[in-house]
Amino acid sequence: MYIFLLEKFRKILKSIGKIETKIIDNIIHRTDKTEKQYILKDYHFRRVIKKEYEPRKIAIVICFYFRRGKLKTLNKSILEIASYNFNTDLTVITNDLKKEDELKLNKILKKRIKKYLIIKFKDLPDENFLPWHSLSVMRSKIKDSSYSHFMYLEDDIIVSSKNISYWIYFRKVLKNINLIPNFIRCEAYKGKLFSVDNPKKIIKNKNPIIFTESKKFGFINSKYPYSAMYLMDRELLKNFLKSKATKIDFSFSNSVMKSLYPIKELINISYAYLDVPKRYHNRLVLPFEKNTIPEYSIIKHSDLKYVKPKSLNKMGYGTINIKNLIA
């Protein structure tokens, strides 16, 4: 009888959580309609593709928990970084390695990257805690004023120089309304690109949105902003590092974060839930032209972990063609 009552109580609490989420969504939707909209300019979206906006110098941290089978995947990310025409400084954080494994890792890096550092962390209780060690690297890098930007990547994420250029340009445009340009993570499968992190389509009239005057272009705020990386300028990183978002328990006070992100994922998305403007789910917004997501905001997930597993497909992940994501 006692177990039966506990199960009933658990289901009630779960239902309350779902109701709370719906209420929050409704408040955001109504506020979005009543508040005056910030109007972007059409020329912003034309200008961003005419020129490459480069960082002065970028510190990059890749989180790589060593597995020999993942070296090929890591190499794809390294190849992309090696193609950048601006000044980079790469740090790879990993677990404690055998000598032969460290040689293999060094071989991949040395072949493509001039300046890099491998930092090994011993006695990790679990591989999910490795990303949190990136904080110590970023705290060290921010002290050096020569760095203008900072990027954290999981080992299977491919970010192009065009992605970085777009972010730098729109960071300045969106800064005065406390929003941050986001990326959409996709997997290429059978000649098509599929969204990885959105189990549902992003509906324009159900999510916070900012239009240009013509309403041809704009930014939309998704409830599912995760992309397995972050890019920050000095101001963003400083604010992040001194905030409560760098604590593992930060998500405990946020029902959305608690339901969406395990410990490993929290480190590269928690900043999006700091100081969120009134009518938004989070601070990250995604660009669109009509109902199309521009190529410059699409990043690649080189390891096909979402489009193939049926268990994830049943939940909606890895099933939505990027062309149909915004409706």
Predicted feature residues:
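N-proximal low-complexity "stem/linker" segments adjacent to membrane-targeting elements
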Residues: 24-79
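Boundary detector for helix-to-coil junctions that initiate low-complexity/charged tails
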Residues: 1-39
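C-terminal catalytic/acceptor-binding lobe
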Residues: 243-327
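Active-site-proximal specificity loops/subdomain of glycosyltransferases
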Residues: 101-148
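Conserved catalytic core of nucleotide-sugar-dependent glycosyltransferases
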Residues: 160-250
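Short beta-strand/loop segment that forms part of the nucleotide-sugar
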Residues: 88-97, 122-123
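Short, acidic, metal-binding catalytic loop of nucleotide-sugar glycosyltransferases
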Residues: 76-88
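Short beta-strand-to-loop acidic/aromatic patch adjacent to the donor-nucleotide binding site
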Residues: 147-158
